[in-house]
Amino acid sequence: MNSNVAQTAGGARTQAVLAAVLLAGFLSVPVWADKGVIFLASVALVQIVFALSFNTVFGLAGMVSFGHAAYFAIGAYACGLLLRGADVSIFTGLAAGGLAGGALAAAIGWVALRRASGNYFAILTLAFAEMLHILIAKTPWFGREDGLTGIKRPAIDVPGLRPIDLAQGDGIFYFTLAAAALLVLGAWVLWYSGFGRCLAAVRQEPDRAAFLGIDVHRARLTAFTLSGVGAGFAGALYAPLAQLLTPEVAQWHFSALPILFCLLGGTSIFWGPVAGVLVFLGLEHSTRNIIGLSEVVIGATLLLVVLVFPGGLAGGAVRLRQMARRKRGPSTAMASTQGRQA
């Protein structure tokens, strides 16, 4: 029992150190980077939130969704329309994006989970996402194929202080960082909560979970809805950052991004998708100037990771750490025995 408590405490300390290092790294970006890299770091923060929201259903609940771009897109357009056409705060836009993503996910999940499962469920989510993509592309209100432009970055009013102007300097980057940090914290709490353990049980043994009294359908629908809320928040963060939204954010290839992030970084560990986002975007940025090379490098990296580390980069790191501990174990025990004999 004491050993388990020590391992849990050690894991919590490791995660706290990792989170602090990531936060410090992002905070340092405006100090040394140009505007292009700062924008890339902002996009990485948005994609981290998107990937973690997707991994709630993929890695935690064991469901595959090919249409998660729908919730990102509806959140982005809900926030973008409000910021463009109404005098509202950016927090109202974010809340609208999260609610829109959650509402759409709840509606699609309610239909899809009742009608299909496994591969058929994944295809059904893709079909709904493509329907939304067509709707956005054909609706004048959303800007059709030309996209939604004129999205403002309203200043944040702070009582007793001067307003924080998100349209000047690196204000939008720091706002995105603060919002993403809070959303990542929320995802972390969900992952390690009692409901998170319930979803893990549903993923591993749904029949046994049902026998123990867990409402499997309700648990999956709740997870799917919460995942949609997270994806909607990610889209809402993206709208004022990009200030331009096109129907491509609802296309199938945008739904493939969080899947690639999770497979690359690992689905069984909370920080796996974060590692996947950073490696993916880092490779894409470093090879962007050579036509066709980016896809080759990313594809080869993903193939190598899947073959060498089936659990992703984060899973591979944990596996290597466990192997190192096992190797140190016998030598440490022998040294301890020799010390007692002396």
Task: Locate the predicted segments by residue.
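Transmembrane alpha-helices and adjacent helix-loop boundaries
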Residues: 2-342
